[in-house]
Amino acid sequence: MAQYVQQLTVFLFQTWYTVNKKKWGLNMLKSWTPGEEPDKDEMKVQLEKTRNRLYDLQMKIKEHKLPVLVLFEGWSAAGKGSMIGKVIRNIDPRFFKVATMSAPTEEELRRPFLYRYMKQIPEEGKFTFLDSGWMEQTVKEVLNGELEGDAYERRIESIRRFERQLTDNGYLVLKFFMEIDKDEQEKRMKKLLSKDDTKWRVTGFDKWQNKHYKKCENVFDRYMKDTNMSSSPWYIIDAESKKWTELQVLEILTEGIDVALANNAMAVPILQNVFSMEKMPLLSEIPLDKTIGEDEYKKELKRLQNRLGE
């Protein structure tokens, strides 16, 4: 039965993914083409509809104990933070948290790569919105020449396993990439730099990214292809227009939640123990007359300490 549920889950996601692919212009980055933007009147109607739908769904998420993790990745100045702000206006503050993932601290760098992101995953029945996540850190390391070859492949494999562990354990994982072209990015940066109260938002890396737009696009495209899975696919969002961006995000978010709720058991839980469990004897069955010599004790203790060190 568990295997059937898992197969059904994958089938539902693949079907939903395929049906909506054309609707949202869903391809990998370099071959991506924008979806068709509705006219002004239709936009207004659809925005109102999807905002209300998300508001209604939050109680169902709570009721069904569905954890929802939403990642916003994309180009600098694409509006990731502001879009999160628009989405959470439709959700009770008790049911979500927002995390902005800046550069890792020295303490975090001494831990496994995904450690700081694992701390942010939501509890049952709640949302977590990540303003940039493990994609941004990975591609920055690639662009800086710090991650390549086998090390890159191991990083990708760890990310795929992590995302699969989340979905196998009942999480809905939605990954958005906010797409704008080089000229639009440059225009937005110039606007931010022209005002004293916003120019701090443009970093040296942001400027470098615009100057090396094509190189960055190649790295982004490779990463997205490597981490695109049926259970946690990438959704490329046309981020040129604010209202159109919001509508795309809300439609994908609400329809993703609908699918997850319809298939309440998202997947088979992961087995936590990979070793066989031995039956423990009752206390009354433990012999109390056994002894061990001092030399044998030291020898066995040393063996076990060495084994533990391995």
Task: Describe the function of each predicted region.
Residues 4-8:
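Cationic, low-complexity basic patches in intrinsically disordered or flexible, solvent-exposed regions
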Residues 14-310:
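Glycine-rich phosphate-binding loop of ATP-dependent small-molecule kinases
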